[in-house]
Swiss-Prot record:
It catalyses: (2R)-2,3-dihydroxy-3-methylbutanoate + NADP(+) = (2S)-2-acetolactate + NADPH + H(+); (2R,3R)-2,3-dihydroxy-3-methylpentanoate + NADP(+) = (S)-2-ethyl-2-hydroxy-3-oxobutanoate + NADPH + H(+). NADP(+) binds at Y26, G27, S28, Q29, R49, S53, D83, E84, I85, Q86, G134. This is Ketol-acid reductoisomerase (NADP(+)). It comes from Streptococcus gordonii (strain Challis / ATCC 35105 / BCRC 15272 / CH1 / DL1 / V288). Binds 2 magnesium ions per subunit. Pathway: Amino-acid biosynthesis; L-isoleucine biosynthesis; L-isoleucine from 2-oxobutanoate: step 2/4; Amino-acid biosynthesis; L-valine biosynthesis; L-valine from pyruvate: step 2/4. Mg(2+) 1 binds at D191, E195. Its EC number is 1.1.1.86. Residues 183-328 form the KARI C-terminal knotted domain. It comes from the Bacteria. Involved in the biosynthesis of branched-chain amino acids (BCAA). Catalyzes an alkyl-migration followed by a ketol-acid reduction of (S)-2-acetolactate (S2AL) to yield (R)-2,3-dihydroxy-isovalerate. In the isomerase reaction, S2AL is rearranged via a Mg-dependent methyl migration to produce 3-hydroxy-3-methyl-2-ketobutyrate (HMKB). In the reductase reaction, this 2-ketoacid undergoes a metal-dependent reduction by NADPH to yield (R)-2,3-dihydroxy-isovalerate. It holds the Pfam family KARI_N. Its cofactor is Mg(2+).
């Protein structure tokens, strides 16, 4: 199904005007949404638990409250805490303070779609999901444009939920460059699949496998790192800018021929079947339940996965090589760490 891109001119109702907005969480997305909305003239407060994020929000000039206090004061509440803590945060501090006619928003549909959070029928539920990390949402806004976003309505109690979603997207700068309407189901399942099968899980597994093939064949680990990881950014940037066509126009004929001949030997029909199995586990809720149950148990699986990943040879080789390349990593990493 084709969807139509919408822009600022399509946001017909200033649905956030006169509303008190509470951004719950001051992490990667939270700081960006809050600051952008404030800069577009909206009345924004922050709800966050005591700690570094609380202090940072106050330092940035926001009226900062506990989550419960902010939820009680607000008309529109955007929950931007990590997915795994949203349920307990909502049940303990937000739900008891909701009133009929309030609106609750999310930047990802995980907890609503999989029904970890159930919002009363007299409250709107909407989504504004920028397609980029928070530091980029903020930086591009300050530069005069923005990051595209998806928007959705899960529950329209007041008849105004879509207007709120679109006006929120406008307030954070996304409508400057483009909005796409979606559903909670579609955004959640596609987002998780993209992360797991391609962007994060698939990509890192592909890089690691390539590194292992080369080093096991006797090639120097340092050279293998450059071939399968370091140069990845150069290729991805070309695809990002102009699709596969621009990338293939920019590489050598040798590389292009090898692309066509060998790509299908690596990503076979069996790999596609494996991807379908990943999608099925997302659709039926298995992944979501496994993730939430691991969090509730103290994150034993996630902790073990992190330790295993940190000890990969490619990570150790890369850390040493990057010391000799000071130009690598000069971006927003330090700013990003502040908010996580």
């Amino acid at each position: 199904m084709a969807v139509q891109m919408e822009y600022e001119k399509d946001v017909k109702v200033a649905a956030l005007d006169g509303k008190k907005i509470a951004v719950i969480g001051y992490g990667s997305q939270g700081h960006a949404h809050a600051q952008n909305l404030r800069d577009t003239g909206h009345d924004v407060i922050i709800g966050v638990r005591p700690g570094k994020s609380f202090d940072k929000a106050k330092e940035d000039g926001f009226d900062t409250y506990t989550v419960a206090e902010a939820a009680k004061l607000a008309d529109v509440i955007m929950i931007l805490a990590p997915d795994e803590i949203q349920q307990e945060l909502y049940e303990a501090e937000i739900a008891p303070n909701l009133e009929a006619g309030n609106a609750v928003g999310f930047a990802h549909g995980f907890n609503i779609h999989f029904e970890f959070i159930k919002v009363p029928a007299d409250v709107d539920v909407f989504m504004c999901a920028p397609k980029g990390p928070g530091h980029l949402v903020r930086r591009t806004f300050e530069e005069g444009f923005g990051v595209p976003a998806l928007y959705a309505v899960y529950q329209d109690a007041t008849g105004n939920a879509k207007n709120i979603a679109m006006d929120w997207c406008k307030g954070v700068g996304a409508a400057r460059v483009g909005l796409l309407e979606t559903t909670y189901k579609e955004e959640t399942e596609e987002d998780l699949f993209g992360e797991q099968a391609v962007l994060c899980g698939g990509l890192t597994a592909l890089i690691e496998a390539g590194f292992e093939v080369l080093t096991e064949a006797g090639y120097a680990p340092e050279l293998a790192y450059f071939e399968v990881l370091h140069e990845m950014k150069l290729i991805v940037d070309l695809i990002y800018e102009g699709g596969f066509k621009k990338m293939r126009q920019s590489i050598s004929n040798t590389a292009e021929y090898g692309d066509y001949v060998s790509g299908p030997r690596v990503i076979t029909e069996q790999v596609k079947e494996n991807m379908k199995a990943v999608l099925a586990d997302i659709q039926n809720g298995k992944f979501a339940n496994d993730f939430v149950n691991d969090y509730k148990a103290g994150r034993p699986k996630l902790t073990a996965y992190r330790e295993q990943a940190a000890n990969l040879e490619i990570e150790k080789v890369g850390a040493e090589l990057r010391k000799a390349m000071p130009f690598v990593g000069k971006n927003d990493d330090d700013a990003f760490k502040i908010y996580n």
